[in-house]
Amino acid sequence: MSNVYDKAQELKQALAESEEFKALKSLHTQIDQDDIAKRLLENFRQLQLDLQQKQMQGVQITEEEAQKAQQQFELVQQHELISKLMEEEQRLSVVIGDLNRIITEPLEEIYGNPNE
């Protein structure tokens, strides 16, 4: 079984060395050094978290909260570094999703493909 864990460690290393990860890490460093970008991103992420928690608790999001979230999103999208960060997060998310799909393929033999 240790072979599976060895392969997981290799995959971790490959991910850390990927262009997607390096770009994301670089953008995080740049944002941390930019007080305005850092504050904008922190505020946006906190608002996202607050709204997600409300939804998980079954609380309806108000129209005002939805508008505020939309305005905050538009604001962070206008900031070049944050916009690039979000693009890189999406790219890395696609890679991780692809890896997850590949890793779980053997389970499809047992359980079938839920997407079919």
Swiss-Prot record:
InterPro entries: Com_YlbF, YheA/YmcA-like_dom_sf. Gene3D superfamilies: YheA/YmcA-like. It comes from the Bacteria. SUPFAM superfamilies: YheA/YmcA-like. Belongs to the UPF0342 family. This is UPF0342 protein BH1149.
